[in-house]
Swiss-Prot record:
The keyword Phosphoprotein does not apply. The gene is miaA. Monomer. The keyword tRNA processing applies. This is tRNA dimethylallyltransferase. Substrate binds at residues 13-18. HAMAP family: IPP_trans. Keywords: ATP-binding, Magnesium, Nucleotide-binding, Transferase, tRNA processing. ATP binds at residues 11-18. One of its GO terms (molecular function) is ATP binding. Its cofactor is Mg(2+). It comes from Bartonella henselae (strain ATCC 49882 / DSM 28221 / CCUG 30454 / Houston 1). The record marks 100, 122 as: Interaction with substrate tRNA. One of its GO terms (biological process) is tRNA modification. Residues 36-39, 158-162 are annotated as: Interaction with substrate tRNA.
Length: 290
């Protein structure tokens, strides 16, 4: 090996990121590090398309399936875990692969040192979002943090709630916290950046094929296991695409066919949102692959 290299591979769900990462890892004798917020959770092996046992036996994979789904795992915790890996593997080539744009941005730009938000505050605002809707909370956000409100959509419920819960818990605006960032773990010019975006029709075909395969491999058993944990539906792991839809099927609220079609629809929409985010947030240093 000529020297340590760091490769970042981002892209929407079902774009072929993991296969590309595996190929490059074998060529570079590199480690693979998860950069996807859902693949960190235990239990959700099939539904989040985590690497197979064959993959992990071929190349060492880190930060996959090690977080209890009852926990609210944050980007700050992920950065802390990445930092430990960087200190452990000081000369090994690394590949960061996943579909969570916020993780990549935090890796390259650092994050704000926002204190942990108490669960009671977090749940209060999520319940208000469900009850009052994003637009009503958006108007409230304008009153407490106009700088941030100007930057986000009135329909972006998650970001609106995040800003309100931070203000509620800390008495400081999220826009204030965002000015105080940690030092990036990886310098922007010290990595190869690959953005994988297949043609839309091909991507949708892959999504449908993979979801059908997930059912054959036992995705419903994972949903049953999650249901037995009786976790709050507000937890991130319980919001993984496939969990709410198939729980509704198991509860007799819709047919299996309706649930599966809904999962396919939600996955397509998620992929579309990912693509939009990557194109709007990533700069020209990212090499676009199709």
């Amino acid at each position: 090996m000529k020297g340590r290299t760091i490769t970042l591979i981002a892209g929407p769900t079902a774009s072929g990121k993991s296969a590309l990462a595996l190929q490059i890892a074998q060529e570079k004798n590199a480690l693979i590090i998860n950069t996807d917020s859902m693949q960190v959770y235990d239990v959700l092996n099939i539904l989040t398309a985590r690497p197979t046992r064959t993959d992990t036996a071929t190349v060492p994979h880190y930060l996959y399936g090690y977080v209890n789904p009852a926990l609210h795992y944050s980007v700050g915790q992920w950065l802390c875990d990445v930092s430990k890996l960087l200190m452990t593997f000081t000369s090994k080539s690394l590949i960061f692969v996943g579909g969570t744009g916020l993780y990549f941005r935090a890796l390259l730009e650092g994050i704000s040192k926002i204190p942990d938000i108490p669960d009671v505050v977090r749940q209060k605002w999520r319940l208000r979002l469900d009850k009052e809707g994003a637009e009503n909370l958006y108007r409230q956000l304008w009153q407490v943090d106009a700088v941030l409100a100007e930057k986000i959509s009135s329909q972006d419920g998650q970001r609106i709630v995040r800003a309100l819960e931070v203000y509620d818990a800390t008495d400081k605006k999220l826009s204030w916290w965002q000015k105080k960032k940690t030092t990036p773990l990886i310098a922007r010019n010290c990595s190869e950046k690959l953005l994988l975006i297949p043609p839309r029709q091909l991507l949708y075909e892959r999504i449908h094929k993979r979801l059908d395969s997930m059912i054959e491999k036992g995705a419903l058993e994972e949903v049953i296991a999650m249901k037995k944990l009786a976790l709050s539906p507000l937890l991130p792991a319980m919001k993984a695409i496939g969990i709410p839809e198939f729980i509704a099927y198991l509860d007799g609220k819709q047919s299996f066919e309706e649930a599966l079609e809904m999962v396919k629809t939600q996955t397509r929409r998620y992929a579309k949102r990912q693509i939009t985010w990557f194109r709007n947030q990533f700069d020209e240093e990212w090499m676009l692959l199709s």
